């Protein structure tokens, strides 16, 4: 089982960017938002996402057929519909749902989420961190280059990808993050909930206590859902810990599932 060159370049590029951000984040972190920094792990891993009312997401007919087919296939032991089983990125928001820790680093222009699973990273661009010029949407063209500047030009980041493009702002002590440009080859959860590349996520992250982080997520995707809907997940702090290497292919070789659910 091998990762394609393009996949390796994406992972390497994101990790390079997040690594470059570490120094900038620590050097310019905001004291008022510093409590968000640290390592977090989900309280209850989410296998099948439900609405705030505990119901199945409001799916369009075509999307519902795909979703229920995925559920039936998984019950039969067929997970070929889930590209994460061969170590493609689980993407956003699924990275926030799985049983894998992540580290948050706070800076004046960025917030970095560094995930232990296969070392994927997400950078949230705060106001002023991106130029205002927005090109047409496109799927990523793999150039073979893995280095990414600390502030990549917007034409390099506004392509469809597994973690999309995240813009954020602090509203008091709440981090509001809007993510779009999400490629439709990923799934929202491990049960197989699909989405289109029109998916828009709005996250409101806040501390419910010194060691409890809440992420309230709003889903908007008219091609997949009949209406916008929300869910909420919580995480607990892991004091004194750092994230470690968790290579998906190594997990598979050891007979473990690609994604710990």
What are these regions (language model features)?
Residues 1-7:
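N-terminal secretory signal peptides that target proteins for export/translocation
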Residues 9-22:
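Bacterial N-terminal signal peptides
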Residues 23-261:
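PEST-like low-complexity, intrinsically disordered acidic/proline/serine-rich tracts
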């Amino acid at each position: 089982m091998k990762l394609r060159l393009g996949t390796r370049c994406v992972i390497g590029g994101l990790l390079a960017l997040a690594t470059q951000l570490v120094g900038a984040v620590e050097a310019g972190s905001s004291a008022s938002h510093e409590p968000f920094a640290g390592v977090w792990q989900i309280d209850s891993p989410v296998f099948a996402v439900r609405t705030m009312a505990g119901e199945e997401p409001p799916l369009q007919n075509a999307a519902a057929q795909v979703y229920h087919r995925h559920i039936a296939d998984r019950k039969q032991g067929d997970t070929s519909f889930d590209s994460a089983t061969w170590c493609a990125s689980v993407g956003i928001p699924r990275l926030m749902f799985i049983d894998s820790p992540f580290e948050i680093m706070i800076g004046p222009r960025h917030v970095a989420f560094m995930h232990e699973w296969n070392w994927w990273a997400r950078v949230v661009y705060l106001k002023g961190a991106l130029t205002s010029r927005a090109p047409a949407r496109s799927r990523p063209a793999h150039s073979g280059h893995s280095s990414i500047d600390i502030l990549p030009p917007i034409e390099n980041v506004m392509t469809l990808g597994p973690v999309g493009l995240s813009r954020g702002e602090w509203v008091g002590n709440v981090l509001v993050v809007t993510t779009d440009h999400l490629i439709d080859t990923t799934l929202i959860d491990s049960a197989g909930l699909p989405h289109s590349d029109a998916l828009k996520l709005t996250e409101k992250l806040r501390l419910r206590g010194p060691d409890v982080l809440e992420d309230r997520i709003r889903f908007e995707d008219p091609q997949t859902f009949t209406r916008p809907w929300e869910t909420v997940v919580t995480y607990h702090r892991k004091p004194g810990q750092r994230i470690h290497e968790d290579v998906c292919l190594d997990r598979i070789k050891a007979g473990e599932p690609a994604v710990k659910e």
